C-alpha cells in the first residue's frame, strides 16, 4: 500500500517551513495583542495568550488559537478579533516576511479545558480507587 506523505512533513503535521512561519505569525499576533494596537475595548480589557498557530500547506491561511487569561469571555474576545481581522492581517503582513499575507481565522484553544476535564476525572474517588488497587497489585 503506498504511503502518501507531504514532502518534508514532520511528526507534528506540517513541513518545517509551515512550522517556522506559524511560529513567526504566533509571535507577531502575541506582540500585537500585548501592545493593544487594535484599540478595541473588548480586547483592551483582556490578556490574551496565543498558544498555537497552524498554517495551511500553501501558507495562505493561518488558524490562530487564542485563550483569554482565566478562560473567561472567550466568545467576546473571538468576536472582537473577528471585527479587527483586517487590521490584524495588515499588522501581520508588516511583521512577517511572506509573499502574501495569510488570511486569518481565530479559534478558541480548548486544550486547557480538556486537560482540566481529565484532571477532574483522575481525581474522582472511583478512579483513585482503581489507581490505588493497581499499584497494590504490582
Swiss-Prot record:
It holds the Pfam family RBFA. GO terms for cellular component: cytosol. GO terms for biological process: maturation of SSU-rRNA. The keyword Cell cycle does not apply. Coiled coil: none annotated. PROSITE patterns: RBFA. Gene3D superfamilies: 3.30.300.20. Transmembrane segments: none annotated. SUPFAM superfamilies: Ribosome-binding factor A, RbfA. The keyword Transferase does not apply. GO terms for molecular function: ribosomal small subunit binding. It is found in: Cytoplasm. Keywords: Cytoplasm, Ribosome biogenesis. Belongs to the RbfA family. One of several proteins that assist in the late maturation steps of the functional core of the 30S ribosomal subunit. Associates with free 30S ribosomal subunits (but not with 30S subunits that are part of 70S ribosomes or polysomes). Required for efficient processing of 16S rRNA. May interact with the 5'-terminal helix region of 16S rRNA. NCBIfam families: PRK00521.2-5, rbfA. Monomer. Binds 30S ribosomal subunits, but not 50S ribosomal subunits or 70S ribosomes. This is Ribosome-binding factor A. It comes from Bradyrhizobium sp. (strain BTAi1 / ATCC BAA-1182). The gene is rbfA.
